[in-house]
Amino acid sequence: MGSANRVRISSIAEVTKGVTPATPALQTERWLSESLAYNIENVQSEQIRADRTEGDLIQVGADSSGDINFELSWGTFDHYFAQAFCNAWVAGALPADPSVLENGTLKLYRTVIKEFLDMTPAVAFVYKGCVVNQISLAITKRSKITGTISLMGLEITETKPAGATYLPETTTSPLNASSNVTSILLDDVPMTSCIDTMSVQILNNFRPIDCVGKFFHSDFNYGAFSVSGNMDLYFETMEQFNMYKAGTPFKLAIHIEDDAGNQYLLELLRCKFETLTTNATGENTDVMASGSYRCSGVGGITARLTKTPA
């Protein structure tokens, strides 16, 4: 009987799409829960039968997909951020210099492996050719900063690569929305409003490419790089409502620093409020300004993530 406490998830970048490198040094992942699955697409025969029985179920394709939920910690999910941004990190000249990631057009693929270590023999599901269709972050008062990585994969096998070794998990502390969010900037000015919760979603709008003679997807093609989110703040001033009413664009920046001094700065360069409501929802409740926002590009760049080591 398998136990969740004996499940290991690991991954490695693919040089060739859908091909796991030989004797891979797999990165052991940190995670909360997962929904990685082998999805088989079936169609049913519509043949009319005189005995009134239904026709056979026919397998016409398969793929892999699912989510990995996580607690954000510095340096742990940078490979998935690169996939979500469709670009590579640009490192600074010195190890202590910041590295920068901006949205681009580079498709990055990973092999992701889920192993059930307490099964005899051990069971492994190997998800090949995985892209990150979406990554999201949730920042809520008095809570850890959590997120979800939504993967789409080309194919799956049950054979673990020969000679695989495992790099250890990172050891940086989970980040929280109380002491690790050092500032939230609106147009480079610290926000004075009290934020209850906010979220960021980065979506690549990947779609599968299917071909005659292929049981699995041949590839994925990306659509628009879409950045959006939600923000609930205590209704204290008309500032955000006036921005919503006038369709005023704003730059949103979130600065996060762990207890060791490692930093992330997420910049969304041009956003507008898409919705915003100010409702009294019941007796003895606070009135919240609850809005959603959507971002567009400035010179082709919609989002920028900067990481700086301590």
Question: Where do the PLM segments sit?
Answer:
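Signature of extracytoplasmic/envelope-associated structural regions
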Residues: 1-310
